[in-house]
């Protein structure tokens, strides 16, 4: 049933995008509920009382929190279709390592690109580019991070792409000139229905980030 799975989310969240993609990769029907993060719903506060953050995946009334954990949960529960994590334990561990790298390194670096200015922004931009180059090196000449099949690391990373134009606008640089293979990977991912349906328009995200930046960077 469609209401068996509920996703509490916020449209420009690169973390929520992961869960949307994973559900669609598995063909799972779900009810999407947009959250107002300035006025969080009672359901969000009830289902994620520790962090009070989106996304929250609710399956048969039970919450699963943290996007990367949600992706693993979705892969395990709906295991009959489109495996997300590799079956080999070593390859699975490697995929988890790179997803963890994205969460620990990329998020903080990208935030400095759009939410700071001056020397701090330049340092953040340098870190951000180095992290993307590390990821591009790991991708190599493979179609996807795990090889021929779209999977866990791809899902962990692809949502950040929707923020790329905002990074470029506010930090005045070209991501494609720095990591062309990574952008080719982005274009390949966007051909997947699960991704295309789950990612918002990057221009709309840039408008959102423009407003958000005003709160962090006084003119």
Swiss-Prot record:
GO terms for cellular component: chloroplast; chloroplast stroma; cytoplasm; cytosol; mitochondrion; plant-type vacuole; plasma membrane. The keyword Translocase does not apply. SUPFAM superfamilies: GST C-terminal domain-like, Thioredoxin-like. Its main location: cytoplasm. It catalyses: RX + glutathione = an S-substituted glutathione + a halide anion + H(+). InterPro entries: Glutathione-S-Trfase_C-like, Glutathione-S-Trfase_C_sf, Glutathione_S-Trfase_N, GST_C_Tau, Omega/Tau-like, Thioredoxin-like_sf. Keywords: Cytoplasm, Detoxification, Oxidoreductase, Peroxidase, Phosphoprotein, Stress response, Transferase. Catalyzes the glutathionylation of 12-oxophytodienoate (OPDA). In vitro, possesses glutathione S-transferase activity toward 1-chloro-2,4-dinitrobenzene (CDNB) and benzyl isothiocyanate (BITC), and glutathione peroxidase activity toward cumene hydroperoxide. It is found in: Cytoplasm, Cytosol. This is Glutathione S-transferase U19. Pfam families: GST_C_2 (PF13410), GST_N (PF02798). Belongs to the GST superfamily. Tau family. The keyword Transferase applies. One of its GO terms (biological process) is toxin catabolic process. Glutathione binds at residues 13-14, 39-40, 53-54, 66-67. Its EC number is 2.5.1.18. Induction: By dehydration stress, salicylic acid, ethylene, methyl jasmonate, auxin, H(2)O(2), copper, benoxacor, isothiocyanates and the pathogen Hyaloperonospora parasitica. Residues 3-82 form the GST N-terminal domain. GO terms for molecular function: glutathione binding; glutathione transferase activity; peroxidase activity. Residues 88-208 form the GST C-terminal domain. The modification Phosphoserine is found at residue 198.
């Amino acid at each position: 049933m469609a209401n068996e799975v509920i996703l509490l989310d916020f449209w420009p969240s690169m973390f929520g995008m992961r869960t949307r993609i994973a559900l669609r990769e598995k063909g799972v029907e779900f009810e999407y509920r947009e959250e107002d993060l300035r006025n969080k719903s009672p359901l969000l506060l009830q289902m994620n009382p520790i962090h009070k953050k989106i996304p929250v995946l609710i399956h048969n009334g039970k919450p699963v929190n943290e996007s990367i954990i949600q992706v693993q949960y979705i892969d395990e529960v709906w295991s009959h279709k489109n495996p997300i994590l590799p079956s080999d334990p070593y390859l699975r561990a490697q995929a988890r390592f790179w997803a963890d790298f994205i969460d620990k390194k990329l998020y903080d670096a990208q935030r400095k690109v759009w939410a700071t200015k001056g020397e701090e922004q330049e340092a953040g931009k340098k870190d951000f580019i180095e992290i993307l180059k590390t990821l591009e090196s790991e991708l190599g000449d493979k179609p996807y991070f795990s090889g021929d099949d779209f999977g866990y690391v791809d899902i962990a990373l692809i949502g950040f792409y929707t923020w790329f134009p905002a990074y470029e606008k506010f930090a005045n640089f070209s991501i494609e000139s720095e990591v062309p293979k990574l952008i080719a990977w982005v274009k390949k991912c966007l051909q997947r229905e699960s991704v295309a349906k789950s990612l918002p328009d990057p221009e709309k995200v840039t408008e959102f980030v423009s407003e958000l930046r005003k709160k962090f960077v006084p003119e």
